[in-house]
From Swiss-Prot:
Residue numbers bearing the Phosphothreonine modification: 175
Functional description taken from the UniProt entry: Acts as a chaperone.
Listed CDD domains: ASKHA_NBD_HSP70_DnaK-like
Induction (free text): By stress conditions e.g. heat shock.
Segments of skewed composition (Low complexity): 589-606
Pfam family, one: HSP70
Alphabetical list of InterPro entries matching this protein: ATPase_NBD (IPR043129), Chaperone_DnaK (IPR012725), Heat_shock_70_CS (IPR018181), HSP70_C_sf (IPR029048), HSP70_peptide-bd_sf (IPR029047), Hsp_70_fam (IPR013126)
Organism: Clostridium perfringens (strain 13 / Type A)
Keyword vocabulary terms for this entry: ATP-binding, Chaperone, Nucleotide-binding, Phosphoprotein, Stress response
Family annotation (PROSITE patterns): HSP70_1, HSP70_2, HSP70_3
Lineage, top ranks: Bacteria, Bacillati, Bacillota, Clostridia, Eubacteriales
The protein's name: Chaperone protein DnaK
Length: 619
């Protein structure tokens, strides 16, 4: 069986590894390095350069050199080179082809399969684009796994006998992720994850670029960012300065002949201190700390629960980042893994699991947002909560909202808000062929299935007839990082408002149910109720109808209470007439058996809830 390679397709650098002798081994590229710059360059003669050789000539060929293409994955962004448009998938495929060729040269055999890592907060479009890039490069992508999870595999492979709770802080060139995992007995279980797919080392570089450019503009009146060749030199100088400041307290930025004007050539000769760099990037570091707080909160994990902190990604070499993580967690970050290589090594381990070379290892990831359906009143009823371990299956019993309803529409939503309209619609489908019955009688089981690849399948089954309908949603995480962050933040900001709106809808639903049940029972009782009693109850019913659609919740509750009390008097009298025990009146809201109605099958089935379904006539 041919080897499956593990690839870390990074924003600034990429890495490839493979399992050998039960251990992950990083493959050295044709230039003798263990990582490859994620850079592609097109030459005037049509030649295409990838990696370090492409990066070296970027200054002299800025228009035809592409960097950080990962930030555009899953978008309609195009790169135009000599009149031809290239998609991010195509550019990424060129990088993957280079890694594939290096792996084949090392192994001495053809490589056709790979496990590729992505940021934990990559959405479905970005993940699919990564798979497409692999396919373009001639690779069958057997699995897409999250970068922090892959790093934990590399860290924990030799620690499977003891239980650990680890926090993985992954700050790469273009993305940031944090994941909290439980490690033990060969199981790597993600507890929670959070991140920002638009935050990374490139942003730190940009702060230095802007600082140099603004200083030069103030002195010379020229904005170097408008000159592509000068800008490329600034980028290289900024990256070099950032790296040097990780080991030195200051660095010299010397760029002779950066530009020229009527007075002659201009040069840059300035000193950048680590203190100034920290000042320029303080807010970026703070953003990562806030994301860590969110990950801990959503996973119900305290800092005292964390046994180890792992730093992943080249940008974690920045002293201010290390210091911030240490100060926040109270723990010295582990130096047991190479931040540039551990993700590729983890991908290789997962590849080994797939081929059977690695045994007794189970990787359990999570779904990033809550999945549910819309029910009566527009409420989002959750079936699978965010940070639920996948694969997973959850089901719940729902019922109809109208008499003789023969079909229902299932509206699948994703998000943290309590109202369906405030969440993301994933899909809709219809279950037809329901046997006609009073509302609340049919039992419809709605089930959610998520496999290890994050693909969602939702099914609805009529328990009486066995009729089934389903939908497969491949875009289960089809949200940008901004949309996910927004969904969670809005859920917190509007939690109280959502709670009040949900309570109001529940009260209105109860009012409607009370009216329906009372009218139905009153009609069934017929002449057993006197005209005077019937008139009093009907007056109370009209009062509930009059207020139930308004915004005065207390008025609705009062009208419902008055109606219930009026009906109690009648029911108590009827029980006494029929030999029943005094005081054992019945509640029109709580009747099972033959009188069961709106949204409930009987009192013993706690899984039955009101569902907002549309009535559709059978053709």
């Amino acid at each position: 069986m041919s080897k499956i390679i593990g690839i870390d397709l990074g924003t600034t650098n990429s890495c490839v590894a493979v399992m050998e002798g039960g251990e992950p081994v990083v493959i050295t590229n044709s230039e003798g390095a263990r990582t490859t710059p994620s850079v592609v360059s097109f030459q005037a003669n049509g030649e295409r350069l990838v990696g370090q050789v492409a990066k070296r000539q970027a200054i002299t060929n800025p228009d035809k050199t592409i960097m950080s293409i990962k930030r555009h994955m899953g978008t309609d962004y195009k790169v135009n080179i000599d009149g031809k448009d290239y998609t991010p998938q195509e550019i990424s495929a060129m990088i993957l082809q280079k890694l594939k060729a290096d792996a084949e040269a090392y192994l001495g055999e053809k490589v056709t399969e790979a496990v590729i890592t992505v940021p934990a907060y990559f959405n479905d479009a970005e993940r699919q684009a990564t798979k497409d890039a692999g396919r373009i490069a001639g690779l069958d992508v057997k699995r897409i796994i999250n970068e922090p999870t892959a790093a934990s595999l590399a860290y924990g492979l030799d620690k499977m006998d003891s239980a650990h709770k680890i926090l993985v802080y992954d700050l790469g060139g273009g993305t940031f992720d944090v994941s909290i995992l439980d490690l033990g007995d060969g199981v790597f279980e993600v507890v929670s994850t959070n991140g920002d797919a638009r935050l990374g080392g490139d942003d730190f570089d940009q702060r230095i670029i802007d600082y140099i450019a603004e200083d030069f503009k103030a002195q010379n009146g020229i904005d170097l960012r408008q000159d592509k060749m000068a800008l490329q030199r600034l980028k290289e100088a900024a990256e070099k300065a950032k790296i040097e400041l990780s080991s030195s307290t200051q660095t010299l930025i010397n760029l002779p002949f950066i530009t020229a004007d009527a007075t002659g050539p201009k040069h840059i000769d300035m000193t950048l201190t680590r203190a100034k760099f920290n000042e320029l990037t303080h807010d970026l570091v703070e953003r990562t700390i806030n994301i860590m707080k969110e990950a801990l909160k959503s996973g119900n994990v305290s800092l005292n629960d964390i046994d180890k902190v792992i730093l992943v990604g080249g940008s974690t070499r920045i002293p201010a980042v290390q210091e911030a993580v240490k100060n926040f967690t109270g723990k010295e970050p582990s130096k047991g893994v190479n931040p540039d290589e551990c993700v590729a090594m983890g991908a290789a381990i997962q590849a080994g699991v797939l081929t059977g070379d690695v045994k007794d290892v189970l990787l359990l990831d999570v779904t990033p947002l809550t999945l549910g359906i819309e029910t009566l009143g527009g409420v989002a009823t959750p079936l699978i909560e965010r940070n639920t371990t996948i694969p997973a299956r959850k089901s719940q019993i729902f019922s109809t909202a109208a008499d003789n309803q023969t079909s229902v529409e299932i509206h699948v939503v994703q998000g943290e808000r309590q109202m369906a309209a405030d969440n993301k619609t994933l899909g809709r489908f219809t279950l037809s062929g329901i046997a006609p019955a009073p509302r609340g009688i049919p039992q419809i089981e709605v089930a959610f299935d998520i496999d290890a690849n994050g693909i969602v399948k939702v099914s609805a089954t009529d328990k009486a007839t066995g009729k089934e309908a389903n939908i497969t949603i491949t875009a289960s995480t089809n949200l940008s990082d901004a949309e996910i962050d927004k969904a969670v933040k809005e859920a917190e900001q509007f939690a109280e408002e959502d709670k009040k709106r949900k309570e109001a809808i529940e009260v209105k639903n109860n009012a409607e149910q009370t009216v329906y049940q009372t009218e139905k029972t009153l009609n069934e009782l017929g002449d057993k109720v006197s005209a005077e009693e019937k008139s009093e109850i009907e007056a109370k019913i009209e009062e509930v109808k009059k207020v139930k659609d308004g915004d005065d919740i207390e008025a609705i509750k009062k009208a419902m209470e008055d109606l219930t009390q009026a009906f109690y008097k009648v029911s108590e009298k009827l029980y006494q007439q029929n030999g029943g025990a005094q005081g054992q009146g019945f509640d029109p809201n709580n009747m099972g058996g033959a009188n069961a109605g709106a949204g409930a099958t009987n009192n013993n089935d706690d899984n039955v809830v009101d569902a907002d379904f549309e009535v559709q006539d059978d053709k």
